[in-house]
Amino acid sequence: MEFKVENLTGIGEYSKKEFLSKKGEHEGELFIAPNDKVFLVQRKNTIEVRTDRNLSKLLREQYESVMSSRYFGIGGVEVVMSGQMSLDEIYDMARLSYNLTKELE
């Protein structure tokens, strides 16, 4: 199971930037909406997306592979790509994250 942002439909333009740790090491990729805000963080085995608090709580209760986001904090979730959550669900969450991020000022 492999998540590829290039296969994500239903979103507009975005840019990609390398995500570095505090030590300057490659940690993953940041995907940025046109308003210069991150909507997705992709690491080797996880992705992080922006959600609302209610959805975040529901997903964490429903799936063992979903936890609070390290990048977004309580405003997002981090999903371990273990196969517990379907790829379609993950693409839906990424779409939602993009749309929520676009609405931010």
Residue ranges and their predicted role:
Residues 1-105:
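Charge-dense, helix-prone N-terminal extensions
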